């Protein structure tokens, strides 16, 4: 078993369930301490930074001699829940795949980052190679927010799983609440009651129309179109009462070029008379396909893989958007596998090794 595979197995063994997703989840304190210790033992200047109680980032730097470009390698440590899984923290290797919670999303990418940084720690580079192992990507990304606010670099690579293709764009999202108001009354008094749930039905009809409109809009070349769906609905107290309120929570997935203001205007248009409020937003991400860091990853991927990687977009949101918004040219490149958030999750071990090799090669060139 290679050192990178041994490292990945140890990472999978550590419970790092995001406590915002699963009450009582372990959080990232233990895995951050392990990651910082592992990298510190291999010559990096490593530390743990608490972001919130029980929530931590591990930051490590292979310091250069000065005068070179810096490179930030970023991967998240938190994982989703394990309900229905059998032995989720006991990594199992079969047919070149490692099974276990987080193996694919995204401890495989984390292991690749750590291995690559360790490989260049004593390489005599001029520029810094910085590792940011971050918390909370699966919820609000408070870890990457901290990194974006406090660190900078000349480029960044996020190692979310891409199947060893080069990802240059991903979607964003907006969460919104819509609330309709009624008048509470006994179910026998239609002359007094106003049905807030029925009013929301009209909003849902409008939502279906908006979804169809978005599906027919001009697609982004890598991401397709934006979308919208109803996520949660609540209203009413009992069968024999007119409901005085109904709350709909929805998600609007966005593509580059769509803004929060655009989304809020669209939702307000289908919900006249209702209260509309955006509760959380993450912008989409896009980097030019000919950006220097994209070209470097593409070139070294060809050398390592013996094939030309595809240039792709990703439907899900990633921490890349936060780094890009902070002014750091960012690209996404990571291992292959399947089962993110699923009962059966695995990562291809050869792809983890090759990802680490590409990252190392990019760092040696970029930070020379």
Where are these regions (language model features)?
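Glycine/serine-rich anion-binding loops at beta->alpha junctions
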Residues: 97-112, 186, 319
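Acidic/His- and Gly-rich active-site-bordering loop/insert found
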Residues: 1-101, 122-125, 366
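Short glycine/proline-enriched coil/turn segments at helix->beta-strand junctions
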Residues: 3, 40-44, 67, 122-126, ...
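Metal-dependent amide/peptide-bond hydrolase catalytic core
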Residues: 168, 175-368
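Acidic/histidine-rich catalytic neighborhood of metal-dependent amide-processing enzymes
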Residues: 106-175, 367-368
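Short beta-strand segments
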Residues: 74-75, 132-134, 157-160, 179-181, ...
